[in-house]
Design a protein with these regions (language model features):
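Short alpha-helical segments enriched in small residues
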Residues: 1-108
């Protein structure tokens, strides 16, 4: 997964740099891997604003203002929660683009 994240981060960096766009992230199961990959690119401060890691449902609610009822009804690993993570971090950080990652970090 790390290799793919790094490859996609380079593409993201080039696109955002050329268009002068600022990006922010909300991550769950990746635990900051996406943000780490982006900031490892030379010049990333030109495009990267911030990131939040909301691993638990409680933090998704407290930091990203996603109602626990919505999480409980749909599951943390759902399209609507990913959408809310992206939308709410975009508003929170006043960036141009946001990326959200949610999933299951299980043993398999």
């Amino acid at each position: 997964m790390w290799k793919e994240i790094n490859e996609q981060s380079k593409i993201l960096f080039n696109n955002c740099f050329n268009k002068k766009l600022i990006v922010t992230c909300a991550e769950s199961c990746t635990g900051g891997m996406l943000a780490s990959s982006i900031v490892s690119i030379s010049g990333s401060s030109a495009i990267f604003k911030s990131s939040v890691v909301t691993y638990s449902n409680d933090m998704k609610s407290k930091i990203l203002n996603i109602p626990l009822k919505l999480i409980n009804e749909n599951g943390a690993v759902s399209k609507i929660i990913a959408y809310n993570m992206a939308s709410n971090v975009l508003n929170l950080m006043s960036a141009d683009i946001s990326i959200a990652v949610t999933g299951i970090a299980g043993p398999s």
